[in-house]
Amino acid sequence: MKSIYFVAGLFVMLVQGSWQRSLQDTEEKSRSFSASQADPLSDPDQMNEDKRHSQGTFTSDYSKYLDSRRAQDFVQWLMNTKRNRNNIAKRHDEFERHAEGTFTSDVSSYLEGQAAKEFIAWLVKGRGRRDFPEEVAIVEELGRRHADGSFSDEMNTILDNLAARDFINWLIQTKITDRK
């Protein structure tokens, strides 16, 4: 959306510049016509008009310079914000944390991945029924609370793990014909 405004601003500046130039050309033609009819040294109005014209030309040139300078500054600002926005986003992502009271650890993620790999390997090998000794630790985790006294989302994770283990035990213990 900003680029549309930028392009529209440039277009307005170009139209304004061409409009001013056509007015200056018209003024010069009318001035040359009146100058040919009267002597410039004897006419004080002509001298004032020349002075006013030179001041107007300077003002016009200066305003064109300021407009182009503003356009350059705006483009530079856009480029800097784009560069800074990317750096800010990267820095923000690096320091972004989870909700208050929870903490993620690379070690725990690694251990969970290893446990999943071991379980899949155990299923593929087709070993017999296995009891899960971690159930004792899970029961202890159920009673754990955060410092503020609220249950965490770990409760849902633990319950999901228990349900998955019960389902896998049921799959292992029942025969294929009993499942239908």
From Swiss-Prot:
Pfam families assigned: Hormone_2
List Arginine amide occurrences by residue: 127
The residues annotated as site (Cleavage) are: 52-53, 83-84, 91-92, 97-98, 130-131, 145-146
Give residues where Phosphoserine occurs: 54, 105, 108, 150, 152
Q: What is its main location?
A: secreted
Stretches for region Disordered: 26-59
Q: Which GO terms describe its cellular component?
A: endoplasmic reticulum lumen; extracellular region; extracellular space; plasma membrane; secretory granule lumen
Where does this one sit in the cell? Secreted
Q: Which GO biological process annotations does it have?
A: adenylate cyclase-activating G protein-coupled receptor signaling pathway; adenylate cyclase-modulating G protein-coupled receptor signaling pathway; cellular response to glucagon stimulus; feeding behavior; G protein-coupled receptor signaling pathway; gluconeogenesis; glucose homeostasis; negative regulation of apoptotic process
Additional comments on file?
In the glucagon antagonist, His-53 and Phe-58 are missing. This antagonist has been successfully utilized to reduce glucose concentration in vivo.
- What protein is this chain from? Pro-glucagon
UniProt source species: Homo sapiens
